[in-house]
Amino acid sequence: MKYAGILAGGIGSRMGNVPLPKQFLDLDNKPILIHTLEKFILINDFEKIIIATPQQWMTHTKDTLRKFKISDERIEVIQGGSDRNDTIMNIVKHIESTNGINDDDVIVTHDAVRPFLTHRIIKENIQAALEYGAVDTVIDAIDTIVTSKDNQTIDAIPVRNEMYQGQTPQSFNINLLKESYAQLSDEQKSILSDACKIIVETNKPVRLVKGELYNIKVTTPYDLKVANAIIRGGIADD
């Protein structure tokens, strides 16, 4: 089976002085979360579409779905975790407890605040996860990347045509993800910033799927302005 996990666990601290977490902020008169969710509803492949959100925002999430007449029976709202990967594992545990997990089950995980993903990106994630077990959505790095450990001087300048910017979705065979996460030490888990690193840390390959430049993550006031411009310009019409 195929599952979607929408990660709505952020509290929006980088958005500044706003009354709601960023996933509930309006984008063209509709919460960002609803824009994102509508993309997944259009994909018939999914057995369940699971939204993971902070415990204190679960009721608000359900109320928002009702307000915007989102009634797809596949949608479930659960409590997120303490961080991104803990939230993903909460979704996995929920799937396991309600449906069980088969060897070929896959999950497509996606940031609730990336509302401009496309049908193509979702379908290619599903197919690549089924075929390869783990997949990341990326775009070519446009700018030169530098690394610095002391935040003052350059340590290295990697070859740009080997650099990519990670987006979401990130998609996995569920058993592969579970088993890989279980192999990590507490120290390894504490420095994870990305779900695909769970797989990389256990020396397993992750396939790349091409994203889109406009598949942005809305985390700052500037991002919100860009997102509104994308909608007004019809840039992300799928």
UniProtKB/Swiss-Prot annotation:
SUPFAM superfamilies: Nucleotide-diphospho-sugar transferases (SSF53448). InterPro entries: IspD/TarI (IPR034683), IspD/TarI_cytidylyltransf_bact (IPR050088), ISPD_synthase_CS (IPR018294), Nucleotide-diphossugar_trans (IPR029044), TarI (IPR034709). It comes from the Bacteria. The record marks 160, 217 as: Positions ribitol 5-phosphate for the nucleophilic attack. The keyword Ribonucleoprotein does not apply. Heterodimer together with TarJ. This is Ribitol-5-phosphate cytidylyltransferase 1. The lineage of its organism: Bacteria, Bacillati, Bacillota, Bacilli, Bacillales.
